[in-house]
Every structure is written in structure tokens, then in C-alpha cells.
Design a protein with these regions (language model features):
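Glycine/proline-enriched, intrinsically flexible loops and inter-domain linkers
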Residues: 1-524
């Protein structure tokens, strides 16, 4: 969790922040949008991309690259085709319209993901030291603004929906899926970065899970201050929304901004210029309570600290036990596998079968749905490397980015499998010519109330921690996604997806995948 390059501790801000030299920092993070993508693949995946990018530019960083890690069920199943088309199109449409290149990722198939696919999105951005913005609320009397899209009823109970198993009637939760607008997000990005340059911002927070109630509590708890919010001032796109709906709506492309008192006009002018709704809905107050009013009537009053991690929110110590299948795997003897002869007649069908397998064949169809050239910074368009290299125009260096996890390895041995995921990401970074710096992770597991699933979770974290210490790549933050299972097919394979950041100081040291000339030696 700590390292020489770390500019923010894990979980301290909306995303990890790592020093890349020359007065610049990289903000990067990976998150999941699994449950929404399972029932509405297009919007579920699209809003996952939007959410992770807002986490980056909320800190004052301009996103320059996106990656994703996708897992689906049986490749030949019609539902897999439907899910895959929708998810890939959602990622592509949102990312392409938003104007950020998708530079890498992975696609994996296994029967266990048939009902519950995994959709993990990663984003990285660049910001100058001293120009970052904290997700904090402080200074009694300072105004609180809601900016971005108007609030609707989409996404209400979205956080609760993501915290339960997918049942046979999961389609009934469709209203819990948010609806995205990448063009609005592009405007919000430019307006936000312009506003930060005015110096009028005290703190800023993306509105994600649980909407207003979550963003106000997180900012207030961090600043040890309260807020008084007038919910009737929230711009809406549906008439007669009730107070609890306004509090819990997860409508996309929205931010909460706390500004310095007396500089309200600067905030309003910037967002008016970009034609983005902006409304003062409250102010910072003394004490540590959140007060929510609807037409002057107090409808909720709660200590902000009671709702956040590290405060009054409960921390559970769960029982866990090793699954029976672990001993079955340990008893397996590889020597029992019949080794084929080295004859061409016997080897060729095996090679053809392997090269045609969905997990080994080309994923070009997926990659071609994403724009990887926009921004003119992706260095792997014509000369790919094991990691994705993205040119940092401000200092002439390059970021190296990779997302990795072999779910089957983690299923067979969570400790070793998670360590292998970190090692694979580090190898990809090194093989591109860069030095590994730091990690973000997305931990996708089943129901934590299942002792065997929780055992997988504990062991995977231990293995990941061991590997990160060995490679000196601190974990900057990330996301834990539980309940990835159906009520009738059981949990998915444990999938701790590793997003790793590296730095290439000298572009002439870039390493690419292609053979260079005849006569060069090949080593294994």
C-alpha cells in the first residue's frame, strides 16, 4: 500500500496517484460493472466505462487510455453471443464517443460465467503535481453544487442490486441499470478540468453507487464537516421525484462540487459555457451530520461517518473453510496424462484444436470495435508490445499498462494463482521495455457468506500481497465485486484481475513482439 512513487495512499482518493517524474502524476484505477452488464449488456458496459473515467478526471487528471477485462460463458451459446455483442458494443460506443483510446485488455471464456459475465474497466490519466483535487468537503458556508446530467429514476437501488446473487428473475432489476451519455461526459470532462484551473474548487466527487447520499457522506466524512442539502433544487428529468429517489438515483454523468464561498459565479459561468446543468443544492455546515430537506421539510439526518469505510460502517470477520475440490486438485498427478508422440499426424490435430479454442484464438474482432488511435498517443497500433504503451506528450515518456488474470489458476490455488496474475502483469510491463510501478485490482468473487468463497478471497489477497511486495508494486486501490454467481448455477471462478502501471523512461527502449531479422537467436 506504500511506495516511493505513491502520491496518495490506497483508498484515499477516487483513484491511485503515482509519480511519473517531471512534475507529472498518473491517476489510474480499475472497477467492475458485472451485474448491470448481465441483464442489460450494452448500457451496463457503457456506464462502467463512463464511471471509471469520471473517477480519473474528478481528481483533475485527463484520461488518456482505457483497458478492459471481460469474461463470458460458453462461446457457442446464444446468450453468450448476445452478452458479448452488447458488452463489446457498449464499451466501444461509449469510449469512442468520449474520445479516449481503448489500448488493451483480455477476453476469457468458461462455463461458470454463463449467467454472470465479468466486465472490468480500467482508465489512466495524467495530471500535474499540485493540480489534483481531493474528494473532500470542508469550510462551513462553502456552497455545494450538483453538476452534469439531470437526475432521473435510472439506477435506483443499483448498489443493492450489485450486492446479491443473480436469480432467475434478474431481468426484473432492469430499472437498476443506469443509462449513459458519452457526449455529456465529454462536456463534463472539459468543464471540470477548466473549473479546476480557476482555483475555486474545494473538493469534488463523482456520483456513482448510491448517488447523492454516497457522495455527500464520503466528502463530509473525509473533511469532518456536515452538509445541508435542499433536494428540491436538484435538476430532474422526471416530474414529482420523491426525496428518497433523489438521494439514491444513480443517473450517470453527475458530480458533486464544493466551492469556495464567494466564488459561486465562477462555477456557474464555467458550466454555463459548456451548456451543462449546474445548481447549488446546499452548503457545508458545522458538525458532522448530513441534513437532507425536501421543500424545507427535514427528511433525513445522519452522521456522515456512519456510512463510510473506516468510520461507523460495520466491518465483518467471516468464517472461511477450504473447499473440498482443493484436495482433489492436489491429488491430481500430471504423469497420468498420456503424452502424444512427436509425429506430425498426431501433433497437428492437437495444434489445430488449441489454436481454434476461444481462449487461444485471435480476439481481433473485439479489438476492432474499439478506437485505439484517437488522441494519437497509443504506441502499439502498428508495433504492439506485451503491455500497451501510451506516449505521455508532456514529458516524452510512455505509460505501460496491462490487465491480467487466469481465473482457472486462481480457482485451482487462490494464493498461487493471484500471485501468478501479478507476475504475469509485471512480465508484460517488463517485456515492453518499461519498469513496473504500481497495481490496481478488481477482485471478482462469489457470495462472501459462503465460507468456501470467502476462503478463496482471503487466500487470493494473501497471494497478491506477497507478489506485490516481491515486485515492489504497491496497490493503489481498486474494487471488490462480490455476489458474482447465480442462485442456481453457483459462483464464478475467483478472478482477481490485476491492472498494472509501468513507466518507459526512454522511448528507444521500447520492445515489440515482432521478429526483427533473419539470423537473430531465439531463447526460452
Amino acid at each position: 500500500r506504500e511506495g516511493d512513487c505513491m502520491l496518495a495512499k490506497a483508498g484515499e482518493e477516487n483513484a491511485g496517484l503515482v509519480d511519473i517524474g517531471d512534475g507529472l502524476a498518473c491517476a489510474f484505477k480499475i472497477e467492475s460493472h458485472n451485474h448491470p452488464s448481465a441483464i442489460e449488456p450494452y448500457q451496463g458496459a457503457a456506464t462502467g466505462v463512463g464511471g471509471i473515467n469520471r473517477d480519473i478526471f474528478t481528481m483533475g487528471a485527463r484520461p488518456i487510455a482505457q483497458l478492459n477485462s471481460l469474461r463470458f460463458g460458453k462461446a457457442e451459446h446464444p446468450k453468450t453471443h448476445w452478452l458479448m455483442r452488447g458488452i463489446v458494443r457498449g464499451i466501444g460506443d461509449y469510449g469512442n464517443a468520449f474520445g479516449i483510446p481503448t489500448v488493451g485488455g483480455e477476453v476469457f471464456f468458461d462455463d461458470c460465467f454463463q449467467v454472470n459475465p465479468l466486465v472490468n474497466a480500467m482508465s489512466a490519466g495524467i495530471v500535474r503535481h499540485g493540480e489534483t483535487v481531493k474528494a473532500i468537503s470542508e469550510g462551513p458556508g462553502n456552497p455545494v453544487f450538483i453538476v452534469g446530467s439531470r437526475t432521473g429514476k435510472d439506477g435506483i437501488h443499483g448498489a443493492a442490486f450489485a450486492s446479491k446473487d443473480l436469480g432467475e428473475n434478474a431481468a426484473e432489476d432492469l430499472p437498476s441499470v443506469q443509462v449513459g451519455d458519452p457526449f455529456q461526459e465529454k462536456l463534463l470532462l472539459e468543464a471540470t478540468l477548466e473549473l479546476i484551473q480557476t482555483g475555486s474548487v474545494v473538493g469534488m466527487q463523482d456520483m456513482g453507487a448510491a448517488g447523492i447520499i454516497c457522495s455527500t457522506s464520503e466528502m463530509s466524512a473525509k473533511g469532518q464537516a456536515g452538509m445541508r442539502i435542499q433536494l428540491e433544487r436538484v435538476p430532474t428529468r422526471q416530474a414529482r421525484m420523491q426525496g428518497w429517489e433523489l438521494l439514491l438515483s444513480e443517473s450517470q454523468e453527475r458530480m458533486l462540487v464544493v466551492a469556495h464561498r464567494g466564488r459561486e459565479h465562477e462555477v456557474l459561468e464555467v458550466f454555463r459555457k459548456w451548456d451543462i446543468p449546474c445548481e447549488q443544492i446546499g452548503e457545508v455546515i458545522e458538525g458532522e451530520h448530513l441534513e437532507f430537506y425536501m421543500e424545507e421539510q427535514l427528511i433525513a439526518k445522519v452522521p456522515a461517518d456512519s456510512l463510510v469505510l473506516g468510520g461507523g460502517a460495520p466491518v465483518y470477520t467471516r468464517n472461511y473453510s477450504e473447499p473440498d475440490y482443493i484436495q482433489e486438485i492436489a491429488a491430481f498427478d500430471p504423469k497420468r496424462i498420456q503424452v502424444p508422440s512427436h509425429s506430425v499426424d498426431e501433433m497437428l490435430p492437437i495444434l489445430e484444436h488449441l489454436s481454434a479454442h476461444p481462449n487461444l484464438c485471435s480476439k481481433e474482432w473485439v479489438a476492432k470495435q474499439y478506437d485505439d488511435t484517437i488522441g494519437t498517443a497509443h504506441m502499439g497500433t502498428r508495433n504492439p508490445s506485451d503491455a500497451s504503451l501510451v506516449w505521455v506528450k508532456e514529458n516524452g515518456k510512455a505509460l505501460a499498462l496491462s490487465v491480467d488474470c487466469n481465473s482457472r489458476y486462481v480457482h485451482a490455488d487462490p494464493h498461487r494463482g493471484a500471485a501468478i496474475a501479478v507476475a504475469e502483469a509485471a512480465r508484460n510491463i517488463v517485456c515492453s521495455g518499461a519498469k513496473p510501478l504500481a497495481v490496481t485490482n478488481c477482485l471478482n468473487f462469489g457470495n462472501p457468506y459462503n465460507p468456501q468463497v470467502y476462503w478463496q478471497f482471503v487466500k487470493a489477497i494473501e497471494g497478491m500481497g506477497m507478489a506485490c511486495r516481491a515486485f515492489n508494486t504497491p496497490v493503489t486501490g481498486g474494487n471488490v465485486s462480490f455476489y458474482n454467481q447465480s442462485s442456481y448455477e453457483g459462483p464464478v471462478m475467483p478472478s482477481p484481475v490485476i491492472g498494472m502501471l509501468g513507466l518507459l523512461d526512454d522511448l528507444t527502449h521500447q520492445q515489440t513482439l515482432d521478429f526483427k531479422q533473419a539470423g537473430d537467436k531465439i531463447y526460452l
